[in-house]
Regions:
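Short, solvent-exposed, Trp/other aromatic-anchored flexible loops in extracytoplasmic proteins
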Residues: 172-217
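Short helix-loop boundary/capping segments
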Residues: 112-181
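Flexible glycine-rich surface loops and low-complexity tracts that mediate binding to linear polymers
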Residues: 48-70
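Beta-strand/loop nucleic-acid-binding surfaces
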Residues: 33-49
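Short beta-strand elements
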Residues: 223-243
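Short acidic/polar inter-strand loop motif in beta-rich domains
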Residues: 62-75, 215-229
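Surface-exposed beta-loop interaction hotspot
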Residues: 68-135
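Single conserved hydrophobic/aromatic residue that forms the stacking wall/gate
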Residues: 1-6, 10
């Protein structure tokens, strides 16, 4: 399954870019690979750099015409030059007991901006990746929870089934410094099983696409903590037909 922003591997012959990768094993060769929006990527040094199941920000160079990639379909991966930059912390997905969006959570903080990057990969190997920007102190620690009430049916927006999710961020440890500044963090959320279920349901209905509308708390009135304003970011997925 892929988001509508996912890239077509074969539109370009040589690719140099940054992206998200989820470490795993090739089903055909059992070699360590990074699953990306360009497919599974392999490099001989990967096994010493990554941990199975972990998410990473990577830089890579991929030549689709190289001899190593002549048998990519047989191998189950593309060979690339890969530099692993950072491991990405995983957020917590919750599909039940969704808190009331009209009330603040304990130590909840607003999100200035939320977005994803199609070139990096919006949805990769079961994980939804987001760039999240907030005003916070250096070294401040936060918890990131993505709520999705699966008991609720989707709404229809411009003839597209749209599911509401809620990203909520709470401070869990103070940072340092005299003033807060705008800081961005990346988080990955594993929603594979639920997304596959939604895809199957939408395929049975004859849908060709569906949206995930991620709502996030954008501002809190300093004089009235019950005055909350929400913004949203929408990710669109193409429906894969049931086999």
């Amino acid at each position: 399954m892929r988001s509508s922003a996912a890239s077509d591997v074969y539109k370009r012959q040589t690719v140099t870019r940054a992206g998200f990768g989820v470490a795993g094993l090739s089903e055909k060769t059992y070699k360590t690979v990074l699953n990306t929006n360009m497919g599974a990527l392999y490099s001989p040094s990967l096994s010493a750099q990554v941990v199975d199941g972990a998410c990473y920000l990577i830089n890579y160079e991929l030549d689709l015409n190289s001899p190593e990639n002549a048998n990519a379909a047989t191998n189950g991966y593309l060979t690339a030059t890969i530099s692993v930059a950072d491991e990405i912390t995983k957020g917590q997905p919750v599909f039940y007991n969704v808190p009331d969006s009209a009330s603040l959570l304990q130590n909840e903080i607003p999100v200035k901006n939320l977005f994803s990057n199609g070139d990096y990969g919006v949805y990769v190997d079961g994980y939804l990746f987001f760039f999240i920007t907030m005003d916070m102190f250096k070294d401040q620690k936060n918890s990131y929870t993505l709520y999705w009430d699966r008991s609720k049916e989707p709404t229809t927006v411009e003839n597209i089934p749209t599911y509401d999710l809620f990203l909520r961020v709470a401070k869990v440890a103070d940072g340092t410094g005299s003033a807060a500044s705008s800081i961005g963090e990346v988080r990955a959320f594993n929603i594979k099983s639920v997304l596959e279920s939604v895809n199957s349901s939408e395929a049975n209905k004859g849908s060709t696409k569906f949206n995930l509308k991620v709502n996030y708390l954008n501002t809190i009135n300093e004089k009235d903590s019950t005055d909350l304003k929400w913004s949203s970011y929408t990710v669109q997925f193409l429906v894969e037909k049931n086999s």
